[in-house]
Amino acid sequence: GIKILEEIIRNNLPAWNDTSEFTYKSFGTPLEYLLYTKLYEPEKEVKSVNCNLAGVYWMYCHGLMKKGRYDEALAAIERAAELNPVDPDVYLQYAELMKLRKNPEGIKFACDKLLQCAVTKEQIGRAYFNYSYYFSEINDPIKAAALLEMCGIFYKPDLYESELQYISNCLGM
């Protein structure tokens, strides 16, 4: 798994570095291209990478996380975000990494970015779920409960009930 991803990265990385004229991005859909151009208003001409290299990097991040190599995982997910700053999967993976690194502000950053580019109900719900986690981490159970409720409008993850119980316990209920 990881060795194959490292080989893909090693073979493709030099070809997709930005130049003075072009910025190279790895969009999964035409909608992501449109979101990127509207949100970031790039000064350089945008050239699309012909493979989902951002996806390779976030999968690589996931593998590194499983091995406890969090610093390397952070570098990988940051590169994924450079290649496609409007890919919701990148920010979902980023949030999971920040949870493991016990970095609440990183979780909030990932949620903020995710809500900018979320296009499905599940992605919106997962952003609210991670916001709920963030507010639990900073000991604000009222906001955590409100955001968990928002999550439930769009998406009910497997952990929904256990998170609700945790927040209820924090509130003394």
Describe the role of every protein-language-model region.
Residues V56, V90, I124-A127, Y160-E161:
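TPR alpha-solenoid repeat register
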Residues G63, E96-L97, Y134, I167:
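Residue-level signature for tetratricopeptide repeat
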Residues E6-N11, F109-C117, N139-L159, Q165-M173:
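TPR/TPR-like (Sel1-like) alpha-helical repeat modules
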Residues L13, C51, P85, V119-E122, ...:
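Short coil turns that delineate tetratricopeptide repeat
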